[in-house]
């Protein structure tokens, strides 16, 4: 999967995250489209932002904020008792997590709820166990 477009909130935390993520992911040549609508956006607003892309991108990266992103994922991926990745998002979409979804659409204007499937979900603690929440042994 080659990301060909990035749409991001212009919030400082997002810009700092992308400054680190883009070179590490080999996508530092892509200039993000900074979209103020993403800041504090509901899932409905995020769907509108995505639909506005039309056919201008095949593989899209959205960098934004919760609860909107978590709600968006849960709206796009249908519930399934066997979907462990969706269950992890239902538990929590932590800061700096990455969710990869696939959709069978050629035009982002065709985006609809319950139309995506999980391919990957990576939390910071999946990459570095020291980032896991503290657990009590008592």
List each model region and its residues.
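Domain-level recognition of soluble alpha/beta enzyme cores
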Residues: 77-119
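Phosphate-coordination/substrate-recognition cap region in phosphate-metabolizing enzymes
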Residues: 1-58
């Amino acid at each position: 999967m080659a990301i060909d477009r990035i749409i991001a909130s212009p919030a400082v935390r997002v810009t700092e995250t992308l400054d680190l993520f883009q070179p590490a992911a080999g996508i530092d040549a892509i200039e993000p489209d900074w979209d103020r609508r993403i800041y504090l956006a509901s899932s409905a607003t995020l769907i509108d932002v995505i639909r506005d892309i039309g056919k201008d991108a095949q593989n899209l990266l959205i960098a934004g904020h919760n609860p909107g992103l978590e709600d968006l994922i849960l709206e796009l991926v249908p519930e399934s008792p066997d979907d462990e990745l969706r269950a992890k998002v239902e538990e929590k979409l932590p800061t700096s997590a990455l969710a990869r979804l696939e959709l069978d659409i050629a035009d982002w204007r065709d985006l609809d709820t319950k139309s995506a499937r999980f391919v990957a979900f990576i939390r910071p603690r999946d990459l570095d166990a020291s980032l896991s929440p503290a657990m009590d042994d008592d």
